[in-house]
């Protein structure tokens, strides 16, 4: 089979300013360049059959071609998109953004023709170069095709190839370049990009002083990058920059990116300095929105802990907002756990924080896309939103439309399999629904570790005897105190005496559903949810009005709840029995419960039960 014909003269045409060609070239050599903490960069010596040039640089998103031996010495490829980058010393680098291997190296015997090194900057381009290189003779149909009509490349030409020039403060001019071409060796550059994420101003104080900062993430057609403004620049730019707006960014400092806490796909990150300018851009229709690289939920189990990644899923259900205190700064923040499911039927527990947690509404089961969530192994596999993450509800992207269509047509009756909890794991999301009969017939709790399940059941009996006790009043201690009979109460754990105490609840309850019953132990929060009163009030009621105290327990009987239960086989005095503990008690979501019953009926009907 004939080899593809090389685009003779293409190198000369590219360096002469032809940005529309799609030349067919041969790889003569590949050299890896160490970039420190970032991924390797590959420098290519390429031939067009007439000349060779060693100034081709492979974009990092194409590294897989070399890593998988698809791109190797002697192979023939077509470069469909590239960027010419001018360095400070006058040299030019051609960054290959898109390419296709047309003929693998093992099918090409060696170097084609007798090409000579191209002398960049030494006189005019060689006359042998045809123009344009991308328009081969009709007799060679295997060669590269003609460039597309200009209208098809309007956005790219407008951004980069068209050579847009921006006036920066001070009267200087700077040419707009793509984000993908930025590197620390450039001095003058401008990018036109959309801000996709903006963090709040954060402050710090240490032995070296104090300061403030905020970070943004921006994207253009070629890629994305993270930028940070410190101190004076933070004050200068914070109110100016808005999410989803497009700006011209000029003259920042570029350095190797720290990828520990961000999923931005760029080897470098930007820092604003005293010369940085940010100018709003009104003509922004062709600048893309957030760029995602979604990882299917089913693949999370094979990813490393602490990986920062993008995820999309339908919100199956959402827990209520809770308040937690961050130990490092003693600051109280909002927290909400939601469960996301994709078309694989896999479910992952995801934690939202702060404003994202407060404002989230999962009642209509929205599509949730998160850019930059961190993966943990707490309770199987779970995700947590970072301060640098972007959370989008029902985003206007094809993946969201596809997921919504799947869920509305068939996904809403899929129960889902959680990867955030496994048999023997910790209590994960609100999944693993079981009837009480299934819990016993499946011998849940008989393994080496505890099992967790969720069930809808009804209170049939509450054991009110000894359900209240007097506990240590210290905030972090719930140990029972001993009445010293002198007006003081002693806590053996704290080794202190107190003039007061607090009431705590340990309530034994018998619950039942349509097929079985189960004794469970309910501690403070769960017991208060069932009784509808807090422990302090119940303690006072028991001391002052025994009849009213009894009525609280009577009124709590025969009420139904959704129980989250931990079961484990435990041994006391050589006798083994299942201990069931209520981890959470919530009112029944009858809409969700009815949906699940309908789903089960359909499953049974399909199985002919």
UniProtKB/Swiss-Prot annotation:
Gene Ontology MF terms: damaged DNA binding; single-stranded DNA binding; zinc ion binding
SUPFAM superfamilies cross-referenced by the UniProt entry: Nucleic acid-binding proteins
DNA-binding positions: 189-273
Annotated region (Disordered), positions in chain: 112-164
InterPro entries recorded: Euk_RPA1_DBD_C, NA-bd_OB-fold, NA-bd_OB_tRNA, Rep_factor-A_C, Rep_factor-A_N, REPA_OB_2, Rfa1
A Pfam family: REPA_OB_2
Entry keyword set: DNA damage, DNA recombination, DNA repair, DNA replication, DNA-binding, Metal-binding, Nucleus, Zinc, Zinc-finger
Subcellular location as annotated: Nucleus; Nucleus, PML body
GO biological process: DNA recombination; DNA repair; DNA replication; protein localization to chromosome
Gene3D superfamilies, per the entry: Nucleic acid-binding proteins
Presence of the UniProt keyword Nucleus in the record: yes
Disulfide cross-links: none
GO cellular component: DNA replication factor A complex; nucleus; PML body
Keyword Nucleus: yes
Zn finger (C4-type) location: 472-494
Main location, first listed in the record: nucleus
Compositionally biased region (Pro residues): 124-151
Domain of life from the UniProt record: Eukaryota
NCBIfam families: rpa1
Family: Belongs to the replication factor A protein 1 family.
Role noted for this protein: As part of the heterotrimeric replication protein A complex (RPA/RP-A), binds and stabilizes single-stranded DNA intermediates, that form during DNA replication or upon DNA stress. It prevents their reannealing and in parallel, recruits and activates different proteins and complexes involved in DNA metabolism. Thereby, it plays an essential role both in DNA replication and the cellular response to DNA damage.
Subunit structure: Component of the heterotrimeric canonical replication protein A complex (RPA). Interacts with rpain-a.
Protein name: Replication protein A 70 kDa DNA-binding subunit
């Amino acid at each position: 089979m004939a080899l593809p014909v090389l685009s003779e003269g293409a190198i000369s045409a590219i360096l002469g300013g032809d940005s529309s060609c799609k030349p067919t070239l041969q790889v003569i050599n590949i050299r890896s360049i160490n970039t420190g903490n970032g991924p390797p960069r590959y420098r290519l010596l390429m031939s067009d059959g007439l000349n060779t040039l060693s100034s081709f640089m492979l974009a990092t998103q194409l590294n897989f071609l070399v890593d998988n031996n698809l791109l190797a010495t002697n192979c023939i490829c077509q470069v469909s998109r590239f960027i010419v980058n001018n360095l400070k010393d006058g040299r030019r680098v051609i960054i290959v953004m898109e390419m296709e291997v047309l003929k693998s190296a093992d099918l090409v015997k060696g170097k084609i023709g007798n090409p000579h090194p191209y002398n960049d900057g030494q006189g005019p381009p060689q006359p042998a170069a045809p123009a344009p290189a991308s328009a081969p003779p009709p007799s060679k149909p295997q060669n590269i095709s003609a460039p597309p009509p200009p209208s098809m490349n309007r956005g790219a030409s407008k951004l980069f190839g068209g050579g847009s020039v921006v006036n920066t403060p001070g009267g200087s001019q700077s040419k707009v370049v793509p984000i993908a071409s930025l590197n620390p060796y450039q001095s003058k550059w401008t990018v036109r990009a959309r801000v996709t994420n903006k963090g709040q101003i954060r402050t710090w104080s240490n032995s070296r002083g104090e300061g403030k900062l905020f970070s943004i993430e921006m994207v253009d057609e070629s890629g994305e990058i993270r930028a940070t403004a410190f101190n004076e620049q933070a004050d200068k730019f914070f109110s100016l920059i808005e999410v989803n707006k497009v700006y011209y960014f000029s003259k920042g400092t570029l350095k190797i990116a720290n990828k520990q806490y961000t999923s931005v796909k760029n080897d470098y990150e930007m820092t604003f300095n005293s010369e940085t300018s940010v100018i709003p851009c009104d003509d922004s229709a062709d600048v893309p929105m957030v760029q995602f690289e979604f990882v299917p939920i089913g693949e999370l189990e094979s990813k490393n802990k602490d990986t920062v990644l993008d995820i999309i899923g339908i919100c199956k259900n959402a827990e209520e907002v809770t308040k937690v205190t961050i130990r490092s700064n003693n600051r109280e923040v909002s927290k909400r756990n939601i469960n996301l499911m994709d078309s694989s039927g896999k479910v992952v527990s995801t934690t939202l924080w702060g404003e994202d947690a407060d404002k989230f509404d999962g009642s209509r089961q929205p599509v949730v896309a998160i850019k930059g969530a961190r993966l943990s192994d707490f309770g199987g596999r779970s995700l947590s939103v970072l301060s640098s993450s972007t959370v989008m509800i029902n985003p206007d992207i094809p993946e969201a439309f596809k997921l919504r269509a799947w869920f509305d047509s068939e996904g809403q009756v899929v129960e889902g399999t959680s990867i955030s909890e496994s048999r023997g794991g910790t209590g994960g999301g609100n999944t693993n629904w079981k009837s009480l009969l299934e819990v016993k017939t499946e011998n849940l709790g008989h393994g080496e570790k505890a099992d967790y399940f969720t069930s809808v059941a009804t209170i049939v009996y509450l054991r009110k005897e000894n359900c209240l006790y007097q506990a240590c009043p210290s905030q972090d201690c719930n140990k029972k105190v001993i009445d010293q009979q002198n007006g003081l109460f002693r806590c053996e754990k704290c080794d202190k005496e107190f003039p007061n105490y607090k009431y705590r609840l340990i309530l034994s309850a018998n619950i039942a559903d349509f097929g079985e019953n189960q004794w469970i132990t309910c501690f403070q929060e769960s017991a208060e949810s069932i009784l509808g009163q807090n422990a302090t009030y119940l303690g006072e009621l028991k001391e002052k009005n025994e009849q009213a105290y009894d009525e609280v327990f009577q009124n709590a009987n025969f009420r139904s709840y959704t129980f989250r239960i931990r079961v484990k086989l435990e041994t006391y005095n050589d006798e083994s029995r299942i201990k069931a503990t209520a981890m959470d008690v919530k009112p029944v979501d009858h809409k969700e419960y009815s949906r699940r019953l309908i789903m089960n009926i359909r499953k049974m009907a399909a199985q002919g039960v």
